[in-house]
Amino acid sequence: MHLLADPETWVAIAFVILMGLFAYLGVHRTVLKALDHRAERIRNELEEAKRLKQEAAKVLADYKARRASAEREAEEIVTSAKAEAERIAADAKAKMEDFVARRTKAAESKIALAEAQALADVRSAAADAAVQAAATVLSQSVKGSLGEDLVAKGIAEVGRKLN
C-alpha cells in the first residue's frame, strides 16, 4: 500500500484516466484536424508567397527591361539632338559665311564704283583745268577771230576725248 500513498502514483493514474477520456471523446482527432488544418494553411501561405515572389520577379524583370529601353531611347534622343544641333550650327555657319561674302563683295563693288567715280571726277576736273588754262594761254597769244575759232575747236576736241 505504500504505492497508493505516493503522490506521483496518483498523478500517473490521473494522467492515464485523462488520456483515456480524451481517447474516448476523440480529442486526438480534433487535435489532428487542427494540426492538419494549420499545416494546410501554412502550405497555402507558402504557395502564395512563392507565387507572389515569382510575380515580383516578373515585375522586376519587366521594370528592368523598360528601364533599359528608356535609357536606350534617351541615348538615341540625345545623339539625334546633338547631330541636329551640329547640323544647325553648320547651316548657320555656312549662312553667315555666305552673308559675309556677299557683304564683302557688295562693299568691294561700292569701293570700286567710288574709285571709278573719283577717278572720273579727277579726270574731269583736270580736263576742265587744262581747257581753262589752254583757253587763257591761247586767248592771250592769239588775238582776233582766228584765236577764238581755234580755242572753240580745241575745247570741243578736248571735251570729246576726255569724256
UniProtKB/Swiss-Prot annotation:
Highest rank taxon of the organism: Bacteria
Compartments annotated for it: namely: Cell inner membrane
**InterPro entries (UniProt xref):** AH/BAR_dom_sf, ATP_synth_b/b'su_bac/chlpt, ATP_synthase_B_chain
Predominant location of this chain? membrane
Give the GO cellular component terms, alphabetically.
plasma membrane; proton-transporting ATP synthase complex
Give the GO molecular function terms.
proton-transporting ATP synthase activity, rotational mechanism; proton-transporting ATPase activity, rotational mechanism
- Write down the SUPFAM superfamilies for this protein, in alphabetical order: BAR/IMD domain-like (SSF103657)
Assembly notes: F-type ATPases have 2 components, F(1) - the catalytic core - and F(0) - the membrane proton channel. F(1) has five subunits: alpha(3), beta(3), gamma(1), delta(1), epsilon(1). F(0) has three main subunits: a(1), b(2) and c(10-14). The alpha and beta chains form an alternating ring which encloses part of the gamma chain. F(1) is attached to F(0) by a central stalk formed by the gamma and epsilon chains, while a peripheral stalk is formed by the delta and b chains.
What is this protein's function? F(1)F(0) ATP synthase produces ATP from ADP in the presence of a proton or sodium gradient. F-type ATPases consist of two structural domains, F(1) containing the extramembraneous catalytic core and F(0) containing the membrane proton channel, linked together by a central stalk and a peripheral stalk. During catalysis, ATP synthesis in the catalytic domain of F(1) is coupled via a rotary mechanism of the central stalk subunits to proton translocation.
What is the similarity comment for this entry? Belongs to the ATPase B chain family.
- PANTHER family, per the entry: ATP SYNTHASE SUBUNIT B, ATP SYNTHASE SUBUNIT B', CHLOROPLASTIC
**Protein name, as recorded:** ATP synthase subunit b 1
Corresponding gene? atpF1
